[in-house]
Amino acid sequence: MAVPALQEKNILLITGPEEYERLHVFPNTYPYVKEDSARILCFKLHEPIQITSVLKEFPRFMVKDFVKSVKGSDFPRFFDNSFSQKEFEHWMEVFYKYRGDLLTGGICIKEYLNLKKYDGKINEYRAFYANNEMISLEPNSGQETFSPAPPAQMLKKYQSVESPFYTVDYAELDDGSWKVIETGDGSVSGLSDRQDYRAFYRSLYLAFS
């Protein structure tokens, strides 16, 4: 249903279409988080990509569209100089097949980061921000609760991105530093597995009260 039709029914969206696109589509968010994010290169869908050119920018890189990757499949986690142009083009065909009708925006090439692991699990946290404050910070990769959390200064730095409700995913690198690895609109971002749902929605309610 279009926004004007919702307004006629006295239904007001917390997040408008422009704000949704700003946080849901990573290249739109990138200008806000690039100081603490992996570097990216963007291409049009089906635009030829020369792997040698990309490798001049990043020694290893991952592939996603403007919203999602195809992790959890047989698609390579990253590409490096061990891949030929022909092999890369084959895998791009696989990528397009796997994403299918869900392809969004274009192709986003992201610098591959070496992430810290604890007992085989990366140390990733998801922060929910609502009305310019962080309302939730939870482990988001199945790691144990004793793993270090992102620096408070970084968490505060991204509490005022131009959207009323969004998420930022943070991950610890091998050297102990932290990076922003993903962002999302709050309405389509999932809660962490062990998160207290009631406490989350209570905090969300209070943020907009």
Model regions and ranges:
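A short glycine-rich, hydrophobically flanked beta-strand micro-motif that places a catalytic Asp/Glu
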Residues: 107-111, 163-174
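Short, surface-exposed coil-to-beta transition loops
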Residues: 1, 120-125, 165-166
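Short acidic-glycine loop/turn motifs at beta-strand connectors
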Residues: 129-133, 174-176
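C-terminal active-site "lid" helix and adjoining low-complexity regulatory extension at the edge
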Residues: 160-163, 172-209
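A conserved acidic, glycine/proline-rich C-terminal tail/linker
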Residues: 154-159, 165
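Protein kinase-like catalytic core scaffold
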Residues: 61, 135, 166, 179-182
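Active-site and channel-lining beta-strand-loop segments
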Residues: 125-128, 169-171
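Active-site nucleotide/adenylate-binding loops and adjacent lid/helix of ATP-dependent enzymes
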Residues: 4-9, 14-123, 131, 135-156, ...
